Every structure is written in C-alpha cells, then in structure tokens.
Amino acid sequence: MENISRLKFFERNGFKMTNPYWAWSGVNKDKKLVMFNVWEHFKEKDNGKLRYIVLCDAWEHATDSSKGFNDSLKNINLVINDDYKLCIAIAEPTVKFAMPVAKEDEEVKIKHIKSSFYFISDVVKENGIYWGYPVKRVNV
C-alpha cells in the first residue's frame, strides 16, 4: 500500500478540497461525488451492515477547526439534497482515540490513508451522526 497524503489521495481521485489544512472532505463536481476520509476505528455493525462515522454534529465544537466542520456540513448536504454520491476513504490514526469525539488529551492524527481503494456509500443521519454504509468498493 502506497503511503500518500490525504491531499494527494483526494487530488489523484479527482476531489478538490477547499483547504488541505483544515478540510475533511472534497468534491468532484463533474462526477457529482463527495469524498470524506473516515477513521478506520469509527465503525460498527448495524443489522449486519458495516457503517462508518462520516460526520458528527458534536464535532462542531469539539475541534479547533470549525471551518473544517462547516465545509464538511456543506459537502454532506450536497449528498443529502443535491444528488451527489458519498465516497469514503479509510484513514488509520496514529493511535485510536475515543469515538465519536476524541478526549481533550488524545492525539487525532492520520498515520496513513488506505490509498488503493475507496467506497461509494449510502448515508443516514441518526442521533446527530452521519453514517456511511459502504455499498461499492472502487479500486484505484
């Protein structure tokens, strides 16, 4: 598996991030796709289906990057309201941290992106959490 940055992974797959320093997601307007990176350990089974946390309302005030949250909220709304498809790329953290909101003293940092694939996913909002349910693997 090639170890590349999140920005390089997004660009290589046609997704433009608003700002590579604080953006958590990117958009491919031509293909009507939105890509989010999701944490590898922010997942659970729901009636036998794997799902990942894509975005959480609690993150708005749990991070020093409200720009990143607002940008991601705008992008998830493209999926919900404007017929864009959700894509998720799996990010492995340097260390696992609390779910869905990291504790104040926990490091939240990407070790690497799983760069050989991403998933096209359905999205469901439940109790303030946007869940991505992978439906199709896209090898890249």
Over which residues does each language-model region extend?
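Short helix-coil boundary/hinge micro-motifs
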Residues: M1-V140
